[in-house]
Structure formats: structure tokens, C-alpha cells
């Protein structure tokens, strides 16, 4: 089938477009939020095609739309002249934990933006999110993440910790940016992601202790992550980070805050999960000094990630949902 989906979350979409369908990715002249088109830093197959609004109106009518934002509803009406859920089958893919968008309201009373509709199912990416949103009348399901397996590549040759985070200066405490000084005191630290400019200054980080890798291509980031001794996930409040699951696939041991879905994703043998930063920093130091323990934890992390977050299961789950809504 032809699936209309906007390029909103590159890592998630990388897994989604590995399926057997045609994926129509809107592109606008400015490649803005209404139409980013194909990814520049991820490898997507030819079945993921860029389409203009005019093409969508005239020749590329989709069979189903995967909505990810309120704005997508408006664009379907404007570009296609069709109403999602009524004359265009639709699923609303909710990437976020509640309370992160303007107007969301306080958790756990955050009402989902389509909570008053019963004609569009909400697909949450974690059971935590499904539980904490007020979904109202909307039917819900959970399709957990799937990862394109980068392979078991961990060497741990560099006695350093790795963190992947996007826009930590803007997002601050939400992604645990304020915890980085404590982490950097426990281990030399490499931070990968987008929007890292100003991170040293904002949190008083020593450039000799903390190195930034701003927006590397995914394949290059995986290669660099695998050389670090361990992966640290200091995030307070987001959905389950795909970078965490990718690190587990690489075979990296994990040290993570026990928040949102992390406690379900990271088994005890894969590393250390706690709400106590001092316990996490102690675990970081232990892995730096015990490479064998890091290797064993990394193997357990990879096994757990493959079992629960494999690509084939993810694609099967999405096929089943899309077939249901297009019946």
C-alpha cells in the first residue's frame, strides 16, 4: 500500500521504511517541517519517495496516512482535500511522553490531542506512554520500537562514556543535561547528537573532559559509540530513546536513569538502572575499570534488545495495524 508519512523522527522512520510498502514523504521547497523529504544522515530504501503537495493531490493518492502531529491533520485536509479517519484511513503515531508539547497540561492528566475522536487509533511507542496519557475515546495500541540491527560492534577500547542527546541546551533537565557534570566527574565523556552548541558553557563542562560530536551520520555515530566502554542514558522524561536501543544492539553496557520505559527495556544483567545519580556514577566507574564486566553486560544488553526490539516484529505489528485500518 501507499503510506503517507512525514519525516518527523529520522531514527524511527528508518525502521518503518524497511517494510514492503511504498512510503510517500512530503517535500516542500524549503524542506521545512511540512516537508523535510528523505533523510540526509540515514540510509533509506528507494521505496521511500519524496512527493510534493501537488503530486499528492494529482497522482499519488495514499491508501493510509500515519499522522504524528496535529499539523498533519491540517495538511491532509489542505493538500488532499480528505479528512483523516473518515475518507482517508489513518493512524496517529504518538512518539512522545505526555506533557512535552505546548498545551499538553500536567501529567498524568495530559489529554491526547485526538482523545475526542474514535475514528483514528493512537499507536503509542511505549506502554508507559499509553498508561500516562488520557486517551479519551480514541482506541489505542502499543507498537514498541524496532531497530535496524547495526551488528554487535562493541570493542570498548576507549575508557570513556558515551551519551546521545538532541538539543540538550534547549531541553535541559528533560534530557538530563544538568546531570552531565556529575557524569563527567566519573568518566571522560563523549556527547553525540544535534544542537550541542553551547553545552560546555551552559553546564560548566571542561572541554578537556567532555568532547562533543555534533550531528554525525548514523553509521559514523554507531562506529564511534561502539569504541566507547559504556553507554549512559541520563534522560528524565522522554519516550524510550532509540539511541539507547541502538547502543544495546551494538553490545554496549548501559547505565541509565530508571525513568519512563527504561525499567522495562534494560534488564538487570545489561547494566545498572537507578533513580540515584550517585549509584549510576559508581557503576560508570566500575565499568571503566572492569572491561570484562562491561563486555558481559553488553552481550546481555544486545540479547535483550534483539529479543524485544527486533525489526521483523516491529514491521509485522505495523502491517497488522495498517491492514486493520484500511479494511
Placement of each model-derived feature along the sequence:
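Catalytic core of nucleotide-activated saccharide and alditol-phosphate transferases
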Residues: 71-169
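Aromatic "clamp/platform" in nucleotide-sugar-dependent glycosyltransferases that forms part
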Residues: 236
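Nucleotide-activated donor-binding/catalytic signature segment of Leloir-type glycosyltransferases, i.e.
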Residues: 198-219
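Conserved acidic donor-binding segment of nucleotide-sugar-dependent glycosyltransferases
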Residues: 268-278, 286-292
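Conserved catalytic-core segment of nucleotide-activated headgroup transferases in glycan assembly
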Residues: 132-136, 148-205
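A charged, aromatic-enriched C-terminal amphipathic alpha-helix characteristic of glycosyltransferases
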Residues: 289-323, 327
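Short hydrophobic beta-strand element within catalytic cores of glycosyltransferases
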Residues: 253-256
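Short alpha-helical segment that forms part of, or immediately flanks, the ligand-binding pocket
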Residues: 222, 245-249, 260-264
